[in-house]
Curated annotation (Swiss-Prot):
One BP annotation, GO: dTTP biosynthetic process
Presence of the UniProt keyword Cytoplasm in the record: yes
Protein name listed in UniProt: Thymidylate synthase
PANTHER family (alphabetical): THYMIDYLATE SYNTHASE 1
Originating organism: Streptococcus thermophilus (strain CNRZ 1066)
Catalytic residues (positions): C161 (nucleophile)
Protein task: Catalyzes the reductive methylation of 2'-deoxyuridine-5'-monophosphate (dUMP) to 2'-deoxythymidine-5'-monophosphate (dTMP) while utilizing 5,10-methylenetetrahydrofolate (mTHF) as the methyl donor and reductant in the reaction, yielding dihydrofolate (DHF) as a by-product. This enzymatic reaction provides an intracellular de novo source of dTMP, an essential precursor for DNA biosynthesis.
Pathway in which this enzyme or protein is active: Pyrimidine metabolism; dTTP biosynthesis
HAMAP family: Thymidy_synth_bact
Length: 286
């Protein structure tokens, strides 16, 4: 059993046994009913990527390719355009969060409001981060924040769930490692937990490659970790499943010091991944 599988089962059990019920919940199911959930607060996990510990479960298949494409949409394309996400990456699940009548920051008609990539572009976040790490890798101010009150007031739109990432550099002997800490305000445990974690591991790997560093540790903090009330059967099924014997790893197949903006989604490869099947179905809360 991988570390991710152990943490996954522990979190599911804790939510089901100790979680409290949401109140005045915002999300809705497609039929318009309120999407209530059981949740815990203050969830934390640590993975040492350099030792092959990756935050992806083997208890069900995870759509890692489309998840990584979303990282490129946000941090390379730096746009909120649904047209770019669909036409360039063939990713469609963000359509449910379209904000009607709000054009994208690149002029396209369809957008998710002034969120995610639009905020990255507005503040030139990636270029500033890379320049800061270039000037002094050991500085303690390497922060990506997507929490922009001005943007929230400007347009409607889903406020970012994974909203802050911090980076630190460590030298161990002759090797330099890049660590990352992801802070998330809210996480759908069964659907999005490993997707979000692996997305930001991919971002960490892209930045490390840019400088020729090794990937180090990945820390994951979630303020509100929940399971929706239409997912309890799937939760019980996941607890019954026996994980596969594989130890999946994400690999970035580009040379060291490849420019961040030259890396492509197809450069990533998930190896030794043989998840338990069949896939489970989930009705999303929007």
């Amino acid at each position: 059993m991988t570390k991710a599988d152990t943490i996954f089962k522990e979190n599911i059990t804790k939510i089901m046994e100790e979680g409290v019920w949401s109140e005045q919940a915002r999300p809705k199911y497609k039929d318009g009913t309120t999407a209530n959930s059981k949740y815990i607060t203050g969830s934390f996990a640590e993975y040492d990527l350099s030792k092959g510990e990756f935050p992806i479960t083997t208890l069900r298949p995870i759509a890692i390719k489309s998840a990584i494409k979303e990282v490129f949409w946000i941090y390379q394309d730096q746009t909120n355009s649904l047209d770019v996400l669909e036409d360039k990456y063939n990713v469609h699940y963000w359509n449910d969060w379209e904000v009607e009548g709000v054009p994208a920051n690149n002029g396209d008609k369809r957008s998710i409001g002034q969120r995610y990539g639009a905020v990255v572009k507005k503040h030139d976040i990636i270029n500033r981060l890379l320049a800061q790490l270039e000037a002094n890798p050991w500085n303690r101010r390497n922060v990506i924040s997507l929490w922009d009150y001005e943007a929230f007031e400007e347009t409607a739109g889903l406020q970012p769930c994974a909203f802050q990432t911090m980076f630190d550099v460590r030298r161990v002997g002759e090797d330099v490692y890049l660590d990352a800490t992801l802070t998330q305000r809210s996480n759908d445990m069964l659907v999005a937990h490993h997707i979000n974690a692996m997305q930001y591991v991919a971002l960490q790997m892209m930045i490390a490659k840019h400088f020729g560093w090794k990937i180090g540790k990945f820390f994951y903090f979630i303020n509100n970790l929940h399971i929706y009330d239409n997912q309890f059967e799937q939760a019980e099924e996941l607890l019954k499943r026996q994980p596969s014997d594989c130890q999946p790893r994400l690999v970035l197949n580009v040379p060291d010091e490849t420019n961040f903006f030259d890396i492509k989604p197809e450069d990533f490869e998930l190896v030794d991944y043989d998840p338990v099947k069949p896939q489970l179905k989930f009705d999303l809360a929007i």
